[in-house]
């Protein structure tokens, strides 16, 4: 995942949290996937990006360390990027 792709995914997740993104279907797919496979990733996406909670509060609320937070965040962002690329919303670079 390139820096530009990561920036784009983060921006679209935040916009979706504010009801301003056409990525809603892609994000819903990722949330459904993580509901079954990794609830921590799902909660991280929900709290950090859709609800706009600060990183420090997300770490505390999920009872995880920063290393785990960054690992799970990258995993979740990558999954959203894969769904977005498959839908033609994110060019693969």
Predicted regions mapped to residue ranges:
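Intrinsically disordered, low-complexity sequence elements enriched in Ser/Thr/Gly/Pro
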Residues: 1-8, 46, 64, 70
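DNA-recognition helix of helix-turn-helix
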Residues: 63-85
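Generic leucine side-chain signal with a strong bias for well-ordered alpha-helical environments
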Residues: 13, 44-45, 62
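Helix-turn-helix DNA-binding module
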Residues: 51-68
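N-terminal interaction/assembly modules
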Residues: 1-36, 56-57, 74, 82-93
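Aromatic side chains
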Residues: 16, 49, 69-70
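Hydrophobic (often cysteine-bearing) scaffold residues that line and stabilize catalytic clefts
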Residues: 23, 41, 69
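Short amphipathic alpha helix immediately N-terminal
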Residues: 36-53
């Amino acid at each position: 995942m390139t820096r530009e792709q990561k920036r784009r995914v983060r921006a679209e997740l935040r916009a979706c949290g504010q009801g301003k993104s056409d990525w809603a279907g892609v994000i819903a797919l990722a949330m459904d996937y993580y509901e079954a496979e990794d609830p921590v990733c799902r909660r991280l996406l929900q709290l950090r990006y859709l609800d706009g909670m600060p990183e420090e509060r997300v770490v505390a609320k999920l009872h995880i360390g920063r290393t785990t937070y960054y690992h799970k965040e990258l995993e979740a962002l990558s999954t959203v990027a894969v769904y977005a690329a498959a839908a033609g919303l994110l060019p693969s670079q």
